[in-house]
Amino acid sequence: IGAFIRQLDNLITLHQRKFEKLTNVKKSMLEKMFPQNGSSYPEIRFKGFTDPWEQRKLTEFVEFFSGLTYTPNDVQENGTLVLRSSNVSNGEVVDADNVYVNPQVVNSENVKVGDIVVVVRNGSRSLIGKHAQIKAFMPNTVIGAFMTGIRSECPEFTNALLNTSRFEEEIAMNMGATINQITGYMFSKMEFKVPCLDEQKKIGEYFEKLDRLVTLHQRKPFLMKWRT
C-alpha cells in the first residue's frame, strides 16, 4: 500500500508540474501571439499571415448582453441558474455557491455555447474582468446583473484576447477610482489590435487546445486525491 501511495503522489506531482509548465507556456504565447507595445505585428504568427493587425473598438467585433436583476424573493432551491462571479474560476464556469431563481421572473436570454461571461461589478476590485467561456450547452442558465455576456464571430480568439495583459490594462484605465465596475460605456471605449477573421480562427484554435491541456493537468491531481 505504501508503494502505491508513493507512486500516486509521484503522478500527482507530475501533473502539477505539467500544469505549471503549460500555464507558463500560455502566458508566454499570449505575449508572443498578440502585438505588444503599440506594434501592429505579433512576434509569432501562423504561416501565410503577414498583414498588420488593425486597431478596432471592442464593440466593432463583439456584441454584449446584459444579466438578470432579481430579488431575494425570486431565489429558490432549483429553477434557472444565475451565473455570478463565484461561478467563474480559472477561466471556467464552475459549480460554486449556485443561485437559482423562479423561471417566471427571468427576462434575460439564456447563455449559449461560445458566450464569454465577464464579471463587471464586484466588491473585490481584483475580480473585475474575470471571465469564462461557455463550453457546453447550459439550459435554463442566465448571467446575473453584475456580469456581462460577450458574443463574437470567433469566440475562442475573443476569449484569448481577454486573457492578455492588454485587456487588464484597458480595465485598469477605464475602471472608476471608487466604484469597482466596468460599464457598457467603458467597454465601448476599449480598443485592441485584431487580425483578419482567418487568423483569428487559427489563434483561437491554438489557445482552445492549450486551455484543454491546462484544464486536464489541473484536474488530474484533484481527481487522484479524491479517489484515494
What kind of feature is each model-predicted range?
Residues 1-11, 15, 54, 201-213, ...:
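Extracellular/lumenal glycan-associated surfaces
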Residues 17-51, 219-228:
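Short amphipathic coiled-coil heptad-repeat segments
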Residues 71-102:
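DNA target-recognition patches
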Residues 141-145, 176-201:
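A short glycine-rich beta-alpha junction/loop motif
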